[in-house]
Design a protein with these regions (language model features):
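N-terminal intrinsically disordered, cationic/polar leader segments
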Residues: 2-90, 106-154
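Glycine-biased, low-complexity coil/linker segments
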Residues: 98-102
Length: 154
């Protein structure tokens, strides 16, 4: 099974990611996104970051996850090569927000991303991704395989 495929969309770029589990499709979506930024084959495991994300919806978790990784690239130049998920929890209960609103079911993802700082002298620059979007976003299980389609603003 392939991990991801790039989608050519007028004015934007997207990808489809595949996995045998929700965790795996999230990892493959992130690796696909990184491949849009640079050639990930030449990256080294020199540094690591730990990312923890919570959301009330699975699709929101995916968008938040990818946007957090984009933030680490924009702010610190960090780009990942390998990802290890340490926690993926579905349907836990979040406490209500201030004012009593919110709470209810949620999803949590915690992962360590291994990679290095992007160096334009050593790494090929491809696309500058601004954000993962909800446009045409879907995440579903088809024939025992999890699949997501996500569009990025560039």
């Amino acid at each position: 099974m392939e991990k991801f495929e790039i989608l050519d969309i007028a004015g934007d770029v997207g990808l489809k990611a595949f996995g045998e589990s929700k965790e795996e499709v999230f990892v493959h979506a992130a690796l696909g996104m990184y491949s849009l930024i640079t050639n990930t084959d030449v990256l080294k495991d020199q540094k690591s970051i730990t990312v923890s994300i919570e959301s009330h919806a699975l699709d929101g978790l995916l968008v938040s996850w990818l946007n957090e990784l984009i933030f680490h690239f924009d702010a610190y130049g960090f780009i990942g090569k390998r990802i290890v998920v340490s926690e993926f929890t579905a349907s836990l209960t979040l406490p209500p927000q201030r004012g009593g609103m919110g709470g209810g079911e949620a999803f949590r993802l915690k992962a360590t991303v291994y990679g290095e700082e992007f160096d334009p002298e050593h790494h090929e620059g491809k696309l500058l991704i601004k954000a993962a979007t909800y446009h045409r976003l879907k995440i579903e299980k088809k024939d025992h395989v999890w699949e997501t389609e996500i569009i990025f603003d560039i």
